[in-house]
Amino acid sequence: MTRRDFAKLTTAAVVIPAFAAIESKFSGVMIGAQTYSFRTLPSLDACVAAMQEIGLGYAELWDGQILPKDRSQVAAWRTNPPMDEIRGIRKKFDDAGIDLYAFNYSFRDEFTDEQIEQGFLMAKALGVTRITASSNVDVSPRVDKFAEQYKIYVGYHNHDSMKPNEFSTPDDWKRALDGRSKYTGINLDIGHFTAANFDPVSFLEEHHAKIVTLHIKDRKKDHGPNMPLGQGDTNIKGVLEVLKTRKYPIPAMIEYEYGMPGMDTVAEVKKCLGYCKAALS
C-alpha cells in the first residue's frame, strides 16, 4: 500500500477486508499496539487500517477512541454505553485480522459501582478477557469484586507521577494486589517504570505471573522525556529477551508517545515495530 493509498483510506475511514490473521509474533513474542498510539488519526477505522498497514496483529483498545467527543457526556455514557456499537468494534478488528486482546478502561475513585461494572460489561461486549486501567490505587478493592464476578483480568497501568494514590512504584501494585483475587494484576509500562528509576527486567522476571500486558516505550531516567525506541534509558531489548527466552505469554504493546506535531504516526510506529523485531532477531 502506498502512502497516497493510505491517505485515501484514512480519509474515507474504510477498513481493508482481511481473510487471515495478521502475524506479528516474532521469536515467539507477541508484538501489538495500544491504540492510543494512533490518537492523531481521524477515526477508529483509520487506526485499524494503520495497524493493518504496519502489520500489527494484537491490539489494546484505548477507550478514548470510543468515548463521546463532548466531555460533558462522558459520565452518562459510562453509565449507559451503546453496547451494540461496542460489539461492532470487535468486528472491525476481526475483519482486519487483528486480535483485540485487551480493553483500556481506567477506573477512578469518583466512578460509581455502576460505572465500574459497565467497564466489565463493555469488555464482554468486545469479547476480551483483559482490561488495562490507569486507575487510583484506592479503587482496586471495588474493581476486584467485579473482576472476580466477570472473570476478567485487570492490569493496573503505571506512570511516574509518584503520587500516593497513583500507580508508580512496586509498592503501589503490592497495595492493590494484596488480598485480592487472581483477576487483579499489572499492566507494566516499561518506559514509565524506567523514568521512575525502577528496573523493568527484574520486575518482569519476579512478577510475570501477574502481568496482563506490557507497554513498550522508551524514556530517560529521573522522570525524563519520551524518546524514540533505543534512544532512552529503558532496557527494551532486555525485556523482549526475557519474553523470548522464558516464553512468557505476555503481549508487548507498542505505545507511541514521543511524537511531535508534524510527525507521521504510521511511519513512527513502523519504526517502533522494526526496533522490536530487530531486538528479537
Stretch-by-stretch model annotation:
Residues 10-12, 16-23, 86, 92, ...:
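Active-site acidic/histidine proton-transfer and metal-coordination neighborhood
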Residues 64, 108, 136, 219, ...:
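Flexible loop residues that form catalytic
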